[in-house]
Amino acid sequence: MASGNCTTPTTFILSGLTDNPGLQMPLFMVFLAIYTITLLTNLGLIALISIDLQLQTPMYIFLQNLSFTDAVYSTVITPKMLATFLEETKTISYVGCILQYFSFVLLTVRECLLLAVMAYDRYAAICKPLLYPAIMTKAVCWRLVKGLYSLAFLNFLVHTSGLLKLSFCSSNVVNHFFCDNSPLFQISSSSTALNELLVFIFGSLFVMSSIITILISYVFIILTVVRIRSKERKYKAFSTCTSHLMAVSLFHGTIVFMYFQPANNFSLDKDKIMSLFYTVVIPMLNPLIYSWRNKEVKDALHRAIATAVLFH
């Protein structure tokens, strides 16, 4: 972690979102509200799926895992960002910075792949309804979930081996509100060519495989749905996919825009805004998107409220 007489810094300084004193407290209140909503909605959805037997289906098992990922994702980033609005020095320890970055990488890949698995689940449910119970058993669901963790952890190990070899002699100021790869690479005093190559290769592998899986799944879904004669069945099929497509568009659209743009178009200020969107805003939106028009979730919520009122 050191090169020559270079000593690895014990702390990094995060520049944060803004250095305007007049914006610090308003932004703190806004993002505190967003974080609170994120935790309440995601943890609430996890609890609801856990206690309601009618939601013990593959689709909701995956949704429960998505909510868990979003809750942890937001917790990895937001509390430290909130602290930067209140602190003058805005420091983060070297170990804290590395752990934050690796957690971020792990959760990003996991969510990326989980959205692809959810698309396949919808394909199996709509295109192969008779075989669906045999294709998507609970055992298969949990094996897929464990597989996602394994792939995400593999990506984590690759980035770990690369980042821990970098030295930071010239500067410890990270021009961001959290420890992401681009601002860390910028202040590294050693070559980051291999790190950048690994980010591109593994990022392309996971993101493109996820996008291709989603696109193929939805091509077959659309071809199946247009052949359905019943308007009610057709509406139900489309409605189960709309929320997932919205979540996919938000997450993958932001990731592709950020990490696959030409180098001459890159801007750290623009990168901060896009990072803010998918690390803070999207985890809040996902449970709202999946619950907004979902009759089964609404019915489960009504049952839970009725049960709580009855026993009190």
Curated annotation (Swiss-Prot):
Keyword Transmembrane helix attached: yes
Gene Ontology molecular function: G protein-coupled receptor activity; odorant binding; olfactory receptor activity
Positions in the Cytoplasmic compartment: 50-57, 121-139, 227-239, 293-312
Family matches, as PROSITE patterns: G_PROTEIN_RECEP_F1_2 (PS50262)
Keywords of the record: Cell membrane, Disulfide bond, G-protein coupled receptor, Glycoprotein, Membrane, Olfaction, Receptor, Sensory transduction, Transducer, Transmembrane, Transmembrane helix
Disulfide cross-links: C97-C179
Spans through the membrane: 27-49, 58-79, 101-120, 140-164, 206-226, 240-260, 272-292
InterPro entries for the chain: GPCR_Rhodpsn, GPCR_Rhodpsn_7TM, Olfact_rcpt
Lipid bilayer topology: Multi-pass membrane protein
Subcellular location: Cell membrane
Extracellular side: 1-26, 80-100, 165-205, 261-271
Principal localisation: membrane
Cellular-component GO terms for this entry: plasma membrane
Keyword Disulfide bond in record: yes
Glycosylation sites: N5
Functional description taken from the UniProt entry: Odorant receptor.
Family: Belongs to the G-protein coupled receptor 1 family.
Protein name: Olfactory receptor-like protein COR6
Species name: Gallus gallus (Chicken)
Protein's gene: COR6
